[in-house]
A protein has these predicted regions:
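Extracellular/periplasmic ectodomains of large secreted or surface enzymes and adhesion receptors
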Residues: 123-168
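Small/polar (Gly/Ser/Thr/Ala-rich) solvent-exposed segments
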Residues: 114
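His/Asp/Glu-enriched, well-ordered alpha-helical/loop segment
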Residues: 6-11, 15-110, 119, 130
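Beta-propeller domains
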Residues: 1-4
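Short active-site-adjacent structural elements
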Residues: 117-118, 134
Length: 168
């Protein structure tokens, strides 16, 4: 089956449950197979997806990618599974999944290693435009200082006039 998937040339979207368990017929003990490693070893690109229960680490993409590395998948393959392979799987590889001239320019600037639990998003750019800056996030300031922060209205984008100004 892995060979036919490889021949198809498309990434395989994996279940959030990354370990397949089945009883060994001889010992009746569970055998565990780390599914991403099977595909990585065969050269089949794969995509990781978060679990619907993202409150635990194993439901988070960074954790799934880090677990892949821990289980012997190359760091490059693990990162591709949450970036370029995902974009390719939905037919958007020409626009998303990596940074290159002509692509949309979606980028997360992180505080450290993307596979580390302590890493946070510092800045976020969508289509090359700033979309988030942790340094100006009122909620982060409240959490880190313990002091309430004033609520400020977001700046109106000059290219998008206010609906009230249009009389609507």
């Amino acid at each position: 089956m892995v060979d036919s998937l490889k021949a198809a040339g498309r990434p395989v979207v994996l279940s959030p449950i990354l370990v397949h368990k089945e009883p060994d017929p001889a010992t009746h003990k569970d055998r565990e197979t780390f599914v991403p490693k099977v595909f990585a070893d065969a050269g089949v690109p794969f995509v990781l997806q978060p679990a619907g229960f993202g409150f635990t680490a194993d439901g988070q993409l960074w954790y799934q990618a880090a677990r892949c590395v821990r289980e012997g998948v190359s760091r490059e393959a693990a990162l591709a599974a949450i970036t370029q392979n995902a974009a390719n799987a939905i037919g958007m590889g020409e626009a998303l999944g990596s940074l290159a001239v002509g692509k949309w320019g979606n980028l997360a600037v992180l505080s450290g290693d993307p596979l580390a639990q302590t890493t946070v998003v510092e800045k976020l750019y969508i289509e090359g435009k700033p979309a988030y800056d942790r340094a100006t996030d009122r909620r982060v300031k409240e959490l880190t200082t313990g002091q309430p922060q004033p609520v400020t209205e977001p700046k109106q984008d000059a290219a998008k006039p206010d609906a009230k100004a249009d009389g609507k």
